[in-house]
């Protein structure tokens, strides 16, 4: 199944219902550059990746990075993989995930990274990982 087709289909089917349950506004989309870009976001709720991807509208296809454990969730793991999620094994230096992300960025696309590598609750102090900086410096 074509990744771009599934991404667009999910956007058109899921977003109208999701936005009713979680109304959000997006500001600053005009600051997203053309070409490859690393989008870094806070991650405090389970729905954050969906909200960020859908807030970017269909103008850009945003590929989020997600923990590999999600790939093992029946049906959801398959669907997310087909929609373009780059699974990363946070317990190891995941060379495959890094190469896939760099390739995507070099093709001029958008990559969504949560710098802490996990959800962070309000008041928690979690040190960020170096992945976002690595992607930005390696792709210019």
Located regions from the model:
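Soluble catalytic domains of membrane acyltransferases
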Residues: 3-7, 11, 18-140
């Amino acid at each position: 199944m074509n990744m771009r087709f599934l991404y667009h289909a999910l956007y058109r089917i899921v977003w109208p219902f999701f936005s009713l349950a979680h109304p959000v506004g997006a500001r600053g989309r005009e600051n997203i550059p053309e070409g490859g870009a690393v989008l870094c976001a806070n991650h405090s709720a389970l729905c954050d990746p969906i909200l960020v991807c859908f807030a970017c509208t269909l103008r850009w296809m945003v590929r989020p990075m997600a923990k590999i454990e999600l790939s093992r969730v029946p049906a959801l793991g398959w669907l997310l993989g087909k929609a373009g999620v780059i699974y990363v094994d946070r317990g190891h230096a995941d060379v495959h995930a890094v190469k896939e992300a760099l390739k995507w960025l070099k093709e001029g696309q958008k990559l969504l990274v949560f710098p802490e590598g996990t959800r962070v609750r309000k008041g928690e102090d979690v040190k960020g990982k170096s992945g976002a900086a690595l992607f930005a410096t390696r792709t210019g």
